[in-house]
Curated annotation (Swiss-Prot):
Family: Belongs to the THEP1 NTPase family.
Keyword terms: ATP-binding, Hydrolase, Nucleotide-binding
E.C. number: 3.6.1.15
Superkingdom assignment: Archaea
InterPro entries the record matches: AAA+_ATPase (IPR003593), Nuc-triphosphatase_THEP1 (IPR004948), P-loop_NTPase (IPR027417)
Function according to Swiss-Prot or TrEMBL: Has nucleotide phosphatase activity towards ATP, GTP, CTP, TTP and UTP. May hydrolyze nucleoside diphosphates with lower efficiency.
Binding of ATP, residues: 10-17, 102-109
Reaction catalyzed: a ribonucleoside 5'-triphosphate + H2O = a ribonucleoside 5'-diphosphate + phosphate + H(+)
GO molecular function: ATP binding; ATP hydrolysis activity
Protein name, as recorded: Nucleoside-triphosphatase THEP1
Top-level enzyme category: hydrolase
HAMAP family: NTPase_1 (MF_00796)
Amino acid sequence: MAAKNFLLTGRPGIGKTTCVVKTAELLVSRGVKVGGMVTHEVREGGSRVGFKVRDLLTGREGFLAKVGAGAGPRVGKYVVHVEELEAVGVGAILRAVSEAQVVVIDEIGPMELYSPSFLPAVLKALDSDKPVLATIHERESSSGRLRGILERGDVKLYTVTLQNRDLLPPQLAREIASLVAR
């Protein structure tokens, strides 16, 4: 089975999200409609205080996690905002499956997996006829929880490194654009 789902893994800070964003920009510049969710850091005074998730089709944002007290699951010093993740992130994935040509999911990680509707949305995207470009947290890519995703015949896994992170976006954009053009 040919790959139509492209997953990027690698150590934290190596450039997985940057690869996905650059690939999405290249696809958009070719006239491809890209949807889904991307995650970015929120910084205050030079310190990371949280993460926001953004819907690529609508531009809507919500907090994925913030430093501090509060109700909700914790990952390290962060409190995961499951409701905002579901409203913005899960909504973005499902919207992209129905409205876009390519689905972006950044990232499949420990924070996102606290949402009971996140993994089903990811699986719906992977099972769709749309190409998926996703990042997967390094620890999750080596754990049993997501082994079923990684062992799919339609998944191609890339490990992002300092050596390949600038080469991957044009390569991925070409591969994905060729799938959309069929």
